[in-house]
Amino acid sequence: MRSDKSRKRFVFLCVAPATILFFIFMILPTLNVFRMSLYERGAYSPNETFVGLKNFQHLLKDTQFIRSMQNMILLVVTVTLITFAFALVFAAILTREKIKGQNFFRIIFYIPNILSVVVISGIFSAIYKPENGMLNSIIGLFRSMSDPILWKGEKLVIPSIIIAMVWQAIGYYMVMYMASMSAVPISLYESANLDGAGRLTQFFQITIPLIWTNIRTTLTFFIISTINMAFLFVKAMTSGGPNGASDVALSYMYSQKDAGLYGYSMAIGVVIFLFSFALSACVNKVTNRDTLEF
């Protein structure tokens, strides 16, 4: 009895500091964001005026905010689908096929993940340069270009950011899936071969179901982190330009804060928070399956 109480006390003492810090630095600031979204406050004035839902009503009429949300959703969906498709395919190839230098390819694919967003943005900004960028130079070898392609112009800026984000993320998830695929017993594939199942059938009927728990976990994590990564790439590569064409919700929130619209920027933050929470819940619901064991 005494040992049981001592154990509970020990667990409480271990958990309490982390819980207190989480409450102070996560819960309280989040609640304060919700509170500030209901007020109007100037940049240099400590006075706050309660406006209720006025900031949220303004959001519905703000075309630039709607555009930034559309950009964010486009980036989240596109980057997630492309990254996970390539990560799974590359992981399957490097795990199942007898390719020399597997560790070398792991390192090569993983390197972009350890680079900072600023470095990656600098690399791709140099590649996308209209005058002497690598991409336009390569295209110029095959056809004459009277006017250089503006990869960071209004029409192509979002696809250009998508490419940079996919390049940065793909290696990390490939390595994670390789670890999961390596744990799948070879005997399952051998039995499938005897039954006449091809590699594609084995991939969808054996590999994917058996590593689905890992896919589901990483998918939820990646979708939420992409919302933040999209902001970092936009901030580093374009600062929301040109003419707000690459603005995402977070970058637009910061621009409103810099303009002194604190309450309005907090309202944008609340919308992003609720969107992230709802998206996570939807992903968990849609990807929920019975766990298969081997």
Segments and roles (model prediction):
Residues 2-294:
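A structural signal for multi-pass alpha-helical bundles of membrane permease subunits
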